């Protein structure tokens, strides 16, 4: 009959955080080895694609690694991917351009109205 293994921690239930792997020791005894949960890659906040250049760790482990492992040296580095940052910059530029165009058109219409009033007098 096969040798049985038991959980080594206090939690007796087969939960996601209490997973075990059965390992045979050099002495031939089967032991339960607790397995850590797999880390997921950080994702872009806009498009959801995996961020390049950022370590794949469990949340608590980010506190122990240096800043270079958690960010990239770019605007929104570590939060947004390069393509989304590019789109944001272009969108912001176009919005500012649109505001300027709107302002110029408004000034031109006001100038035209003033010239019409002067012409009528």
Curated annotation (Swiss-Prot):
Record bears the keyword Cytoplasm: yes
Give the family, as the similarity comment puts it.
Belongs to the eukaryotic ribosomal protein eL34 family.
The entry lists its GO molecular-function terms as: structural constituent of ribosome
Spell out the PROSITE patterns in the cross-references: RIBOSOMAL_L34E (PS01145)
A GO cellular component annotated for this chain's UniProt record is:
cytosolic large ribosomal subunit
Q: Which Gene3D superfamilies match?
A: 6.20.340.10, 6.20.370.70
The protein's job, in short, is:
Component of the ribosome, a large ribonucleoprotein complex responsible for the synthesis of proteins in the cell. The small ribosomal subunit (SSU) binds messenger RNAs (mRNAs) and translates the encoded message by selecting cognate aminoacyl-transfer RNA (tRNA) molecules. The large subunit (LSU) contains the ribosomal catalytic site termed the peptidyl transferase center (PTC), which catalyzes the formation of peptide bonds, thereby polymerizing the amino acids delivered by tRNAs into a polypeptide chain.
Put simply, this protein is called Large ribosomal subunit protein eL34A
Subunit structure and binding partners: Component of the large ribosomal subunit (LSU). Mature yeast ribosomes consist of a small (40S) and a large (60S) subunit. The 40S small subunit contains 1 molecule of ribosomal RNA (18S rRNA) and 33 different proteins (encoded by 57 genes). The large 60S subunit contains 3 rRNA molecules (25S, 5.8S and 5S rRNA) and 46 different proteins (encoded by 81 genes).
Q: Which UniProt keywords apply?
A: Cytoplasm, Ribonucleoprotein, Ribosomal protein
Extra facts: Present with 23600 molecules/cell in log phase SD medium.
């Amino acid at each position: 009959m096969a040798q049985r293994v038991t959980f080594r921690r206090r939690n007796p239930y087969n939960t996601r955080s209490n997973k075990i792997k059965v390992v045979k020791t050099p002495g031939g005894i089967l032991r339960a080895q607790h397995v850590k949960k797999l880390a997921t890659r950080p994702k872009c906040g806009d498009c959801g694609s995996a961020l390049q250049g950022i370590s794949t760790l469990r949340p608590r482990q980010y506190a122990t690694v240096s800043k270079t492992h958690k960010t990239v040296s770019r605007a929104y580095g570590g939060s947004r991917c390069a393509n989304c940052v590019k789109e944001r910059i272009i969108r912001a530029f176009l919005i500012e351009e649109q505001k300027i165009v709107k302002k110029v058109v408004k000034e031109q219409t006001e100038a035209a109205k003033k010239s019409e009033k002067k012409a009528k007098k």
